Amino acid sequence: MVREEEKGIPVRVVRCRPLVPKETSEGCQMCLSFVPGEPQVIVGSDKAFTYDYVFDPSVEQEEVFNTAVAPLIRGIFKGYNATVLAYGQTGSGKTYSMGGTYTASQEHDPSMGVIPRVIKLLFKEKEQRQDWEFVLKVSYLEIYNEDILDLLCSSRERSSQISIREDPKEGIKIVGLTERNVASARDTVSCLEQGNNCRTVASTAMNSQSSRSHAIFTICIDQKKKNDKNSSFHSKLHLVDLAGSERQKKTKAEGDRLKEGININRGLLCLGNVISALGEENKKGGFVPYRDSKLTRLLQDSLGGNSHTLMIACVSPADSNLEETLNTLRYADRARKIKNKPIVNVDPQAAELNHLKQQVQQLQVLLLQAHGGTLPVSINSMAPSENLQSLMEKNQSLMEENEKLSRGLSEAAGQTAQMLERIIVTEQENEKMNAKLEQLQQHAVCKLDLQKLLETVEDEELKENVEVIRNLQQVLAQFQSESAAAAEAATEMANAEQDAAGEAETGQVTKRSSDDFTTQHALRQAQMSKELVELNKALALKEALAKKMIQNDSQLEPIQSQYQTNIKDLELEVSNLQKEKEELILALSMAKKDVNQAKLSERRRKRLQELEGQINELKKKLNEQAKLLKLKESTERTVSKLNQEIREMKNQRVQLMRQMKEDAEKFRQWKQQKDKEVIQLKERDRKRQYELLKLERDFQKQASVLRRKTEEAAAANKRLKDALQKQREAADKRKESQNRGMEGVAARVKSWLANEVEVLVSTEEARRHLADLLEDRKILAQELLQLKEKKESGENPPSKLRRRTYSITDLQASEMDLSLSKQIESLETEMELRSAQIADLQQKLLDADNGDRVKQRWDNIATILEAKCALKYLLGELVSSKVQESKLESSLQQSKTNCSDIQKMLIEERNHATEMEAEFQNQLLLQEQQHQQEVLYLLSQFQQKEAPGKGVEDSLSEQEKQMQERLKFQEKELEKMREICEKNQELLQENDVLKQKMLLVQVASGQKLRRDQQVSPESPDSPFDYIPPKPKTRRQTVAKPRAPTPEMNVEELFSDSEESGEEEDAEWVPVKAAKGTKKSATGCFCKGRCGNRQCGCRKQKVGCTAGCSCDSTKCRNRDPGFQDATVCEDQTKDSEGSFKLEDLRDVTAGETFFQPVYSPPTMKVLKDITDQGVFMKKPSTAASLLVRDEESQENQLPFVKKKKRMLSSNTSFFSGCTPIKEEID
């Protein structure tokens, strides 16, 4: 383990799976071989790869785990990170090796993969370490289409929140990923099952359960020692199941599957680039493209980082996957060069504490060594020294001084704010002055000619006023000129800055914006100040009014008290007077009764009047006092209202002042920021000025150097002119030598490039042939499997084996009736031959695809001259190939156009032939119906002839009538037959023309000609059959023939009826027609020796004549005497125009087509008629005949020929007819 840690080389394992049933059924062979006892695998015959471990197909899962994976798991408890990585093409067994489809029900299954075995081993090791505390967390994610998906999250909504972060201490971290605490193996397996159920899986042509994403199952382990909390470790275990690399040609992926495959291959390509960058020894410390893919980003620690890594390269042994297997082995071989640097992962705080403790111990040891091995007692009880006290005092004084300075700074800030307010006020006054100045300028527009006015004005006072106005105008003009000069100076300064710094526009915009902001601030301040002044005035007025009213109230208080006293006295006096009045009224009323008291009552009356007057006066005074009191109350209300308004105005003034201060503070901050910017701009301007000076100095230096160089150039120009001639001569000589050398180099480079191109083209052709051979072997394997199944089930062998083939023996075997065993043996032999060819081609491709040759291909080009020659040659070859390709494309297009035209013509001819065939068949049916009616009529006449009960006296007369009728009828029929013969001759000629056209069309379309020979019914699918490909349709059948019927063309159908002859078969069974492609109207048309009964002349018991189509040198049926007699007899019959009717009773069974009357001779005829009716119920259309192969025609024509023979064999009988339906009924 120590050596492994020092080297830091990840372990590489190659595991080979056995052939799957699909590969076995396709006939695939093993392309890998393993060296017993050595970790070596051999591809083909001589290409060997060596790894740390190699497992052949017979090795079980347990051995793989114990040998390669278990050591990594034990290192996890020591604080090391570990990664187990499965890589390979799709369908090579990665998920099987990793256990990606494991469930709890497979606990004791020997095929259990790496992940469940790791879980078991982890918890087993955990139970053995009782002095440690463990915390285990698991997470499960997949990378699907470059998106990270959390497989332990119930909803996929959190997947968008997952991100990858890099911690300098902990390495790669995944933020937002679900981590679950697990305490037992059962909990961990349940998390694994949940993730496996959520993983993306789909079916492809290579694998029914193909993983469509990269899956990473991570187990985090935190362990702490129980008796030492500072001793802790943190480690991670990544179990990675990569999706397999795939080719769209083999997987047949489309749509989403194709997109998934593209993303999978992209991620694996990035992984390969990372492995290549890490494995190149000459580029140590170079850039590693971890960030090109999320897969490589997550595996950054596992590849070249802090981790022990195990890569399991899964390969397929089938020779059909040889190229992918070779790429996988090379991939794993590159990964062997990666060197990781694993370290023990400890808690950083605990590590820091341990480091500090070690440092303290070291310092204590040093102190002990300095004091002679003992620590002095004064170290623990030593008080703070005087130096420390002085420092503390100094620190205290500095803090006090800092506080003073802070207070002074705050006061200075306040004063600054006041100064800013004064500046604002001053600016406002300045703005007012400017406004007045503008007004004066407006008034000064209409300037008067003061000099003329002075001359015309005589009044002294007016002259003085005009003089004052003129002085004011002079002052105004001077002020304007000064302002203009100041503006010009500012403009010049701005222009100078623009020339120096190149930022005049920006400065002007900034200055303009600053001036606008300042003006707006000043206007706001002025407006608020004006509002404040008005508010203060109104407040002062209201305060004065309130004060005045309060003073009046204070003065009214003694008067009010006096008035109240007077009111009370007056009220008392009024009440007394009222009482007195009442008494006087009572006394007066009493006095009226007493006459003696008249004078007294008079006095009392007067007194009463006086009292009433006093009472009225007192009431008036009371009313006035009441009015004064009401006035005081209203005054108090007014005072309270004024006080309320004063308070509101004070609040408003406070708010306004606060707003002014805030605005002033904002302006101060803005001003401070602008001052900083101005300082920065000035600093930048100084730098630019310095750079400008530096550039000027450099320019002067360059100018001086340029002058010196110009002088030197002028001096050297003369020398150059003298040397030009020599240079031209040398250049001409060098050019001649280069041309001579270029010819040899061009020839060498051309031959080398031609050889390389030929090798590459041969390699590609070999690959193409290899693919064809693999496909051919697959088809052969399928056919072999079908034959074996049929042999087991006892079925008959197929009539033809449809397959691709490269040998002529296959064509011959397709037409032969082989037994199943022979066919199986031949297929096995062919498969062995194909396998040998495949192995040979694959070995040659392995030799041709040598990686060193590809790298050293361009080493032969070492100079620019050779490169130019190579480019010139390649460019010429490219142009010539493009021109040739263009010619071939135009030729192909023309051929396609011609082919389409010929196909159209062929379709038209077929349509015409179909129409003609339908028409001929209709005519044939009509003729046959007529013939059957005649036969029935003759039979009925024959039965009547034999029937008893007829009188002798009536027989002669009736017989004469019948003979006359027969003669008439025969003459009519002869006329009809002559017409039919003429039509047949015309149709035969037309048929010959159509055949010639059909032949021309087939030759023009490049199709093979159909052989006009009888095809065996056991092999109707001959490879020389009709060539134009058509979809196979359901064959239209007619009534079953009892014997194989030969094919018949149109000439045979409409040939002369006399060629068929008589048949000796009692049941009218038609015999086979002789083979031939062309038949004449008379005589036989045999191709052979005319030795059997298939010869038409031999059937009629006549010899062959010169009109026959048979070969006279081979014919055995040529008898001149017999032949001439037959011909003369035929001519005699034709010249008479009628036939001699024989007595039906004298006809023997051997010389007629009918049996005697007592036998039922019409059953065969009726059956044939019924079959013909069934045949006519299915008429063939032009469209169906276009897609029908020649097999249907071969099946129909013999039946038609049979009917034609039946028609031609009865031309000597003519009679009335009876409907067929009656006879059938």
Swiss-Prot record:
This is Chromosome-associated kinesin KIF4. One of its GO terms (molecular function) is iron-sulfur cluster binding. ATP binds at residues 88-95. One of its GO terms (cellular component) is chromosome. InterPro entries: Kinesin-like_fam, Kinesin_motor_CS, Kinesin_motor_dom, Kinesin_motor_dom_sf, P-loop_NTPase, Tesmin/TSO1-like_CXC. Residues 719-738 have a biased composition (Basic and acidic residues). Binds 1 [4Fe-4S] cluster. In the presence of oxygen, the [4Fe-4S] cluster may be converted to [2Fe-2S]. Residues 498-520, 717-744, 1006-1047 are annotated as: Disordered. Belongs to the TRAFAC class myosin-kinesin ATPase superfamily. Kinesin family. Chromokinesin subfamily. It comes from the Eukaryota. Keywords: ATP-binding, Chromosome, Coiled coil, Cytoplasm, Cytoskeleton, DNA-binding, Iron, Iron-sulfur, Metal-binding, Microtubule, Motor protein, Nucleotide-binding, Nucleus. Expressed in proliferating cells; neuroepithelium of embryos. Residues 507-520 have a biased composition (Polar residues). Iron-sulfur (Fe-S) cluster binding motor protein that has a role in chromosome segregation during mitosis. Required for mitotic chromosomal positioning and bipolar spindle stabilization. GO terms for biological process: microtubule-based movement; mitotic spindle organization; spindle elongation. Pfam families: Kinesin. Its cofactor is [2Fe-2S] cluster; [4Fe-4S] cluster. Residues 9-338 form the Kinesin motor domain. The keyword Phosphoprotein does not apply. Residues 1004-1225 are annotated as: Globular. PROSITE patterns: KINESIN_MOTOR_1, KINESIN_MOTOR_2. Residues 352-1003 form a coiled coil.
